[in-house]
């Protein structure tokens, strides 16, 4: 009987991030697109500034990469989040499943693994579809910084 109960526990509750298969790891991504917004770094302080400028490969409406399998070929600066480098990505959003699970927390109620679709995530405005702009339409990237430093307010 105990074995049957174990199989009813979702993998993200029964495994550590290190124990997950590649498919399980990939499925944790809610597809919000926040990783696909460009970031700028202050050369003097190394502070990271978030913009609403979407990577050229991001389909803003669906918040999915147009060329996910070949993304590093098209975008050499694309981020590859792995089990090994996860601790170095302090900038991940507070809603990110990778971050939440690494911190011993659960998935949010709107997460696609719980709801079966991205609709709830989009409804909660977690995804970037309502703020992202196309890279090709941007003239001055600094005009698109979301977390401006005090001196630029």
From Swiss-Prot:
InterPro entries: Puta_zinc/iron-chelating_dom, UCP006173. HAMAP family: UPF0260. Belongs to the UPF0260 family. NCBIfam families: PRK05170.1-1, PRK05170.1-5, PRK05170.2-1, PRK05170.2-5. PANTHER family: UPF0260 PROTEIN YCGN. This is UPF0260 protein YcgN. The lineage of its organism: Bacteria, Pseudomonadati, Pseudomonadota, Gammaproteobacteria, Enterobacterales. The gene is ycgN.
């Amino acid at each position: 009987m105990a074995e049957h109960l174990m199989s009813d526990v979702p993998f993200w509750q029964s495994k550590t991030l290190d124990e997950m298969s590649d498919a399980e790891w990939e499925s944790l991504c809610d597809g919000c697109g926040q990783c696909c917004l460009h970031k700028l770094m202050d050369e003097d302080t190394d502070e990271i500034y978030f913009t609403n400028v979407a990577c050229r490969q991001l389909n803003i409406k669906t918040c999915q990469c147009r060329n996910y399998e070949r993304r590093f070929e098209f975008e050499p600066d694309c981020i590859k989040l792995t089990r090994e480098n996860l601790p170095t990505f302090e900038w991940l959003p507070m809603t990110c499943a990778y971050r939440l699970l690494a911190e011993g927390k659960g998935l949010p109620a709107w997460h696609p693994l719980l709801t079966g679709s991205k609709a709830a995530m989009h409804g909660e405005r977690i995804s970037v579809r309502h703020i992202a702009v196309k890279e090709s339409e941007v003239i001055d990237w600094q005009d698109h910084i979301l977390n401006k430093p005090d001196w630029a307010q």
